[in-house]
Amino acid sequence: MAPLHESLSSINDVIESKPLFVPITKPILQPNSFNLSEGSLCAKDSTPILFDVPQNVTFTPFSSHSISTDAPLPILLRVQANAHKGGFLGFTKESPSDRLTNSLGRFEDREFLSLFRFKMWWSTAWIGKSGSDLQAETQWVMLKIPEIDSYVAIIPTIEGAFRASLTPGEKGNVLICAESGSTKVKESSFKSIAYIHICDNPYNLMKEAFSALRVHMNTFKLLEEKKLPKIVDKFGWCTWDACYLTVDPATIWTGVKEFEDGGVCPKFVIIDDGWQSINFDGDELDKDAENLVLGGEQMTARLTSFKECKKFRNYKGGSFITSDASHFNPLKPKMLIYKATERIQAIILRRKLVKESGEQDLTELDEKIKILSEELNAMFDEVEKEESLGSDDVSGSGMAAFTKDLRLRFKSLDDIYVWHALCGAWNGVRPETMMDLKAKVAPFELSPSLGATMADLAVDKVVEAGIGLVHPSKAHEFYDSMHSYLASVGVTGAKIDVFQTLESLAEEHGGRVELAKAYYDGLTESMIKNFNGTDVIASMQQCNEFFFLATKQISIGRVGDDFWWQDPYGDPQGVYWLQGVHMIHCSYNSIWMGQMIQPDWDMFQSDHVCAEYHAASRAICGGPVYLSDHLGKASHNFDLIKKLAFFDGTIPRCVHYALPTRDSLFKNPLFDKESILKIFNFNKFGGVIGTFNCQGAGWSPEEHRFKGYKECYTTVSGTVHVSDIEWDQNPEAAGSQVTYTGDYLVYKQQSEEILFMNSKSEAMKITLEPSAFDLLSFVPVTELVSSGVRFAPLGLINMFNCVGTVQDMKVTGDNSIRVDVKGEGRFMAYSSSAPVKCYLNDKEAEFKWEEETGKLSFFVPWVEESGGISHLSFTF
C-alpha cells in the first residue's frame, strides 16, 4: 500500500503512457484544510472547529494514509482533488478495552445537523448548537461554519475490529465511542476512527466525504458504482400491512387482482413475513407455527427450513387460474387482524392488572381470552378448508406452482420478492434443523450505547430468546442455499430485515465487525449468483456498520422507520403526526444513505387519512412506489393511485433522490412551530420541490421516544424559490447549466396556478395547514428564435410528478416544438401564443388555450402499442 498521492501519481503515469487516453495532470499536493495545534482543531488556518481537544487525540491528513482500493479511476481522481479537505481523528488510551470512549474536543454556539439511532435498526435527524446536544449513537454530525461560508462533517468510522459512533459529553464535549462487540477483542489506539471533511456546499460535503471513505476503507461502494434493481421504476404491493402474518396464496392473488380491476396492476409484489417455515423452541421440528396474525407473535420463532410453510406448500398448481380465487373472502385478513387485536388487548390488560394491582380473580377476563382464542382458531380452520379447494387438474404444487400461476394470470407482474431476516427468521434458525451450518443459539447482548434508544418490542423479543446463529464460516452456504431455492421456485428478490442483530451476537466470533464481514460477504455473493446482483431491499439497517460493510452490492434500502398508520402507544393524534415523522426520517437519512444506496421511502396505504400526503412524497422521492393496502374494494383509492402510477405499472420517477433544501438542513420541521419541510428533486426537463407541514411531534430525549406535541400541530408558513433546487447536484437536468439565467415556469399542484420565476425573483410565500403539502414544479422556458414564442411543458397534470411524464422535448424548426409524454390524462404547457396547429400522434388535435394565463391543454389517451407514450407537436 502507498499514500494516496503516490498511488494516484503512478496511475497517472500509466495513463500518460497510453495515447488512447487524454493525459491527466499529476496531483499537486495542497496544504490540508485542518490543523490540530495547542488543543484546537482549526479549519482554513484559524477558524476553530473543536476546542479543548485532549492531548491523546491525533489528526492526520487524508493524503498521508495508505490505500489499497478497487475504486474506479473517476472516483479516485475526485478523491485526490479533494484530499486536502479532510483527514482522520484518532486517540490512544493507556489500557486496551473492547469499548473505549474519548472526547474529540468541544463545540458550542454552532448549528449542527446530525443523524442518530433512535432504535437499534432506525436513524433520524437531530439538531442543536453544542456537543452536549448530540444524542447517543450519532452516525455523523454536520457543523455550519458561517464565518468561512463552509460546512464540516465529522463521521465516525470503522477501524480494524472496532466500529464508532458519537455521543454527547458535558460542557459541549463531543465523545467518540469505539466498540468491538466482544470482550475478547480489545484495542487501545486508533489512527482513523473518525473522518472530518470541509466544503462550502453541504451536499458536496457528504459526497466528497463518503467518496473519501469509500477509497480509504474499500469495504463498500457508492451508489454511482452500482446498478439499481428493476423495481425502482415501478409500482408494487407489499403484503405486510395488508394482512400481516396471515398472508397466503389466496390473499396475494386477490390483492393483485383488485389492483388490476382498479386499472393499475403492480409490477412487483413483496410477500412479507408469514410465508416461511418457522416454529418455536420446544415445537416438533417439522411442524410449522400456526395461526399467527400480528407482528410480534413470530419474533421468538426460528427458521426450520428454507422452503415455504404449509399455507404455501399446499397450493395446487392451476387452482386459481380458472376460479381467480373467487372463493376467497377479501375481508378475511382484516377480520383475523381485528380478532387477534381484540385478543392481544385482553392479554395486555390482564398483565397490567396483575402487575399494577396484583389482582388475583381474573376469571372473567381469562374466560374472555379463552373465547377469543377459540374464535380465532375457528376462523383459521375455515380458512384452511377454503385453501383445500382447488383444481383437479393439478400442475405442480407449492411456491413454484403459485408464482408460475401468478405470472401466467397477471402478465404485467415482473418481480416477486419475499421477506426474510438477516439471520433467517426473527430469532434466526433452529439449530437442530441446520446442523450442517453449525448453527447455535447465541445470547443477544445489547451494547450500552443503545441504552438511550426507544423501547422496542422487537429488541425485547430477540433478547428474550437469543438468536439461532449460523456459524460465520457457513454464511456463504447459508445464503446461497436459501436464495438458490427461492430463485428455483420463481422468486426474483428479497426484502431483508433485522440487519443490526449481528452487532449483539459477536462475543464468540471476533467482534461485530468481523462477524458482519463474514455475513455480508456471503450475502453479496448470493445476490450476484441468485438475484441478478441487485434485487435485494435492505431494511432495519440504518447503522453506519451496514453502510460501511454491506453495500458493495446492495443498491437500495429503506431510509425511514415503518409506515405507522396509527400510534402503537395509543395517541389518537398519532394517525396524523406519525406521518410527518416519517417524512423527516426519509428526507434527512437520504443525505448520507443516498451516497451508497437508492433511498426507499417505504409503503403506505392509499385509504389512509394522510394518504395524499404520503403519495406526494413518494411521487418525487426518486425511488419505487408501493402500497400495503388491505384487501377489499373500499381499501383502495384508485383516483390517488393513478396520480402515482401509469396503467402499465411503471411510474414517472424523478432522476435523482429527494433531499432537504439547504434552508431546511438546520431547522426542526417537527416541533419548532415555524418550519416547513422542503425537499427537492429533478426530472429530465426540470426540478420539483415538495413542501410538507410535519409539525406536531418529535423525539423526546428525556423519554427516549417519539411523542406528539399538540401545541405544535399548527399552520406554518415559509418561502419557496427556484434556487432552493440545488441544480448542480444533477447537471443533466434541463436548466441546470450554470449559464442558464432564464425564466422558469412554476406550477403549483394543489391550485394549478402557474407563474414565472428566475434567480433574481423574490421568493414566493407558502402557507400549509397541519398535515398538508404542496408540490411545485419548475420548468425552464424555451423561446423560439423566429417567432419569439415562449414555451414550457408541464406534462400530464393529473399526475403528482407531472413533469416526470415528459419523456422528451425538442425544437424541431423555427416555429415548431415536439414533446413526448407518457400516460393518459390532461396535458398542460405554457405557451405565450396559441399554436397554429397541434398534433397528437400525427393527427391534428383540438386544444384549449387561455390568453390570460397562457395555459395550453388537451386530453392525451393511453397508447398501448407505444408503451403509453404519445407524440405531441406544436406549430406556431
From Swiss-Prot:
Single GO molecular function = galactinol-sucrose galactosyltransferase activity
Which GO BP terms sit in this record? Answer: response to oxidative stress
SUPFAM superfamilies with a match to the protein in the record: (Trans)glycosidases
Q: Which residues carry this modification: Phosphoserine?
A: 7, 9
Know the name of this protein?
A: Probable galactinol--sucrose galactosyltransferase 4
Matching entries from InterPro entries are given as: Glycoside_hydrolase_SF, Glycosyl_hydrolases_36
Induction / repression: By oxidative stress.
Assigned protein family: Belongs to the glycosyl hydrolases 36 family.
Q: Which UniProt keywords apply?
A: Carbohydrate metabolism, Glycosyltransferase, Phosphoprotein, Transferase
- Which Pfam families is this protein grouped with? Raffinose_syn (PF05691)
Top enzyme class: transferase
Q: Which reaction does it catalyse?
A: alpha-D-galactosyl-(1->3)-1D-myo-inositol + sucrose = raffinose + myo-inositol
| Task of the protein | Transglycosidase operating by a ping-pong reaction mechanism. Involved in the synthesis of raffinose, a major soluble carbohydrate in seeds, roots and tubers.
